[in-house]
Amino acid sequence: MDMTSCVARRTRSRTESYLNSILNKSKGISGEEEDQSLGCVNSRTEKRRVNMRDACSPSPRKKKRRRRKDDDDDVVFVRTEYPEGKRDDENVGSTSGNLQSKSFDFGDRVCDFDADDRNLGCEEKASNFNPIDDDDDVVFVGTVQRENDHVEDDDNVGSASVISPRVCDFDEDDAKVSGKENPLSPDDDDDVVFLGTIAGENQHVEDVNAGSEVCDILLDDANLRGEEKTYVSDEVVSLSSSSDDEEDPLEELGTDSREEVSGEDRDSGESDMDEDANDSDSSDYVGESSDSSDVESSDSDFVCSEDEEGGTRDDATCEKNPSEKVYHHKKSRTFRRKHNFDVINLLAKSMLESKDVFKEDIFSWDKIAEVDSREDPVVRESSSEKVNEHGKPRERRSFHRVREKNHLNGESFYGGEKLCDGEETINYSTEDSPPLNLRFGCEEPVLIEKTEEEKELDSLWEDMNVALTLEGMHSSTPDKNGDMLCSKGTHDFVLDDEIGLKCVHCAYVAVEIKDISPAMDKYRPSVNDNKKCSDRKGDPLPNRLEFDASDPSSFVAPLDNIEGTVWQYVPGIKDTLYPHQQEGFEFIWKNLAGTTKINELNSVGVKGSGGCIISHKAGTGKTRLTVVFLQSYLKRFPNSHPMVIAPATLMRTWEDEVRKWNVNIPFYNMNSLQLSGYEDAEAVSRLEGNRHHNSIRMVKLVSWWKQKSILGISYPLYEKLAANKNTEGMQVFRRMLVELPGLLVLDEGHTPRNQSSLIWKVLTEVRTEKRIFLSGTLFQNNFKELSNVLCLARPADKDTISSRIHELSKCSQEGEHGRVNEENRIVDLKAMIAHFVHVHEGTILQESLPGLRDCVVVLNPPFQQKKILDRIDTSQNTFEFEHKLSAVSVHPSLYLCCNPTKKEDLVIGPATLGTLKRLRLKYEEGVKTKFLIDFIRISGTVKEKVLVYSQYIDTLKLIMEQLIAECDWTEGEQILLMHGKVEQRDRQHMIDNFNKPDSGSKVLLASTKACSEGISLVGASRVVILDVVWNPSVESQAISRAFRIGQKRAVFIYHLMVKDTSEWNKYCKQSEKHRISELVFSSTNEKDKPINNEVVSKDRILDEMVRHEKLKHIFEKILYHPKKSDMNTSFF
């Protein structure tokens, strides 16, 4: 027991004496009688002090054990009164014996309390005894245990031998039935609380509740001031001891009540007793004998439990039997989670009736349970210090968290809609709320472009960082903390103007010269400095006006250039597009509508028009071009009902593009289960609370059909909904998706290229012939796949296209002899498709971006890796062999992730397999991992981010583990891992984080199939491709993720290969396919020819690695921009 508790008990004793004196004066007792009465009180007080001293001494903790309750447990000892002549030294009110075997004689007056009923209402049940004199109405109400005391075993249940009794004496006449207490002295009221009143001889039990106001007292062991809180009620009298906002646990009086607290429900709080949980008085008096056995036990009478999930709980309701005048308690079961469904039903009702929902309707359920949070700080402290049965502090749960958790279920229902509350808006969006803009209204700082001198200086510092990194690489005694020991014991630092603060005895540099602030007197302001500042910021007014006029975004094209053309539908947009986008815009209009002149257009378009293909290089703005076209097309043909089909990873990109350019046209994403807010009101009203996937999709389809809007859907979902012919309930989806679209847009249009696939067959059944195919890599593997794509885009020319490509494929199979004929037929095919295929080879990227450098790096494997590569069984399945070859060429331990054949088990052996397990985190045992880890570390010193591609997730995870072990990095911070199993929303967060220049991410490990199309990864300037794939377009798409509009740095591409493997042969075949693709889809415009000048002439990171003494042995050969002659050369 601490000092605070001792002082509190001493103050309580003084307060009792003071109250006794006031009571005696009110009764007219003389001083002598008062002294006699004080003698008895002093005797009891002295015994109480002895108990208090015993309680101050710590007692050994005993193992707590729960026992089964007996029928006599509801008998509680109240007091002992001695007639005249009894010894005064007997223990007054001792309750150390077993309660169930004791019955005390009070001289024909017995007081039996029902423990269970007292637990419910925190009040005592008084027996019917007649007071003999004026002091008989002073009773010993009960004892309150110390906070850490528990029931120990079966023999001392309800023991209070170590408890200091607390006695409160009240005059029956002074205690008002209306619940008003006598005011306490301001000096001595710290420990006294009003517990209640006991009916007298001639007063009926029910008269206690005759008043309309009943006192509800807040009692807590630590509430030393004994503050009262009065509530207005008709019948309820309750004593509450909780100050928690969320639980309102009940204070248990007496020794039996502490047994309930120390039981298994102790850590979840005591029973909730609020005004709604009690319909009648829960503490009525029932006169029974002490040996009565038909009293209901607390287990069957009232049980309250509350799980942490906000689950079920039992509320006690009281029913009165008029004949017996006994209150029986009946359990009623309610569900706390029912509120979630109430909110959902309320929101659904508001959606159906199109009316607002007010806060008081939604949150009215929790008004009753809320407690005034302005309680005394001492009470708060006491509540937080309560312990559970395991001796651990009880977890304090915030009430607003429970409300927030309940609201989440409602949010998931209506998918981010907004409900109005008068003028206040309640946003239930499940999207993460945007961060607060603390600089709102402030002028954004102007970015000052560095001068050539500053750029050169930065380049020198980066070179120095690379040199320092290479110098400390692969050291025999690496230092984890970055501190070097000096040869002289301690460093002696001097300032070198070129290096910094370095040691004179060793090469250790404590502070680099770039981090040392120069003396201020060297840089005093001058006239030249003022001129530089005025040039960078605060330009004169004419210069600023001239700059604004040159901004393409603020320029509105004159009507002379666009009058009478389709550009008039989107004024001010033409000059914001690149030249190849302007050409593509007019090309689409000519193919779909026949002309670009408004007066020649009709409501149905030109007869005989068909689809077209926009074959612009990846990263040149095909999505932006298509959005502008749809905006203009819907202004002329608002009932055309365009539908966009794209890979699932690009649906979010389309939504962002439509929102970014302020098209003001609804975009309904069929893959999302959230309503956009632009859906048709009548269609939404038909939901009637049904949030099934297909129900929401049908609402979007109906809204798309009724309004001028765009429908977006992914390839897999379109295949699922449109291909089900016989499934019940799916025919309507098929009919709407196949027959209703008036314009079809296929992003990554090369996806449906296999005529045996279901998606290709479904798309051939689409009724409209107005189709737009977007693809930067139209030629994939062979001419047959190209023919399938061209026939989908132009169904009217299907026969002509098929015959021409069939002849071309024959020539390609003849080898070298048929190469001349092949080139001639490619020219004919190119001329045939020129009127519906618009090609741009990406010259805009070479003109506007810093540059691109592509190279093939051939590496020498170490001994262990080469041994595993040589023992791979080449006679197995082709796909299994390719997987093992790609995995082992990265690191030999990846062989354990493959399925070995019987031959491989015999050749490699268990001993080698055990060695591979130990080599997993040793990155230097694999030549590709050795190159990659060192390359990433060096790139980090020059603040360049690395993008790593691989076909296999096991390979990416191994690299991540090695980076964590070697560089002490963390996944999600410095390392990002993105593959097909990552959710779409998480992918977008990773992309945004990686593209931020000031983020801590250093490397992105990406799956080739999941991250090679449609996304922008311009944050990376170094791209490493670990595997060689057969399809050349896969690598082209992967490279275009970094080399695209928005890139600020020169981009370097590294194709890693291992010497003496089949990777080089695969790369040569891939390059041949790429050559054919360039022949077919080359631009006929001389201005659009690719630039052959090598923009990037130096790769300082790779050059430093090749010259480094400990790294140069891993390099066999490096080919920059491999030529045709290199494809026919085998240097392995």
Curated annotation (Swiss-Prot):
Domain Helicase ATP-binding: 603-796
Entry EC no(s): 3.6.4.-
InterPro entries in the record: CLSY/DRD1, Helicase_ATP-bd, Helicase_C-like, P-loop_NTPase, SNF2-like_sf, SNF2/RAD54-like_C, SNF2_N
Top-rank taxon: Eukaryota
Pfam families, alphabetized: Helicase_C, SNF2-rel_dom
Binding sites annotated in the UniProt record for ATP: H616, K617, A618, G619, T620, G621, K622, T623
Organism: Arabidopsis thaliana (Mouse-ear cress)
Region (Disordered): 24-104, 224-331, 376-396, 525-544
Ranges annotated as biased composition (Basic and acidic residues): 81-90, 255-269, 310-326, 376-392, 525-539
Residue intervals passing through the bilayer: none
Polar residues bias (residue ranges): 92-103
Motif (Nuclear localization signal): 47-54
Helicase C-terminal domain: residues covered: 934-1087
Name of the gene: CLSY4
Summary of the function given for this chain in its UniProt record: Probable chromatin remodeling factor.
One Gene Ontology biological process: gene silencing by siRNA-directed DNA methylation
UniProt motif DEAH box: location: 747-750
Designated name of the protein: SNF2 domain-containing protein CLASSY 4
Cellular component per GO, a single term: nucleus
Composition bias type Acidic residues, residue spans: 243-254, 270-282, 291-309
Subcellular location: Nucleus
Family assignment from sequence similarity: Belongs to the SNF2/RAD54 helicase family.
Low complexity bias locations: 233-242
Oligomer status and interactors: Interacts with NRPD1.
Keywords in alphabetical order: ATP-binding, DNA-binding, Helicase, Hydrolase, Nucleotide-binding, Nucleus
Gene Ontology terms, MF aspect: ATP binding; DNA binding; helicase activity; hydrolase activity
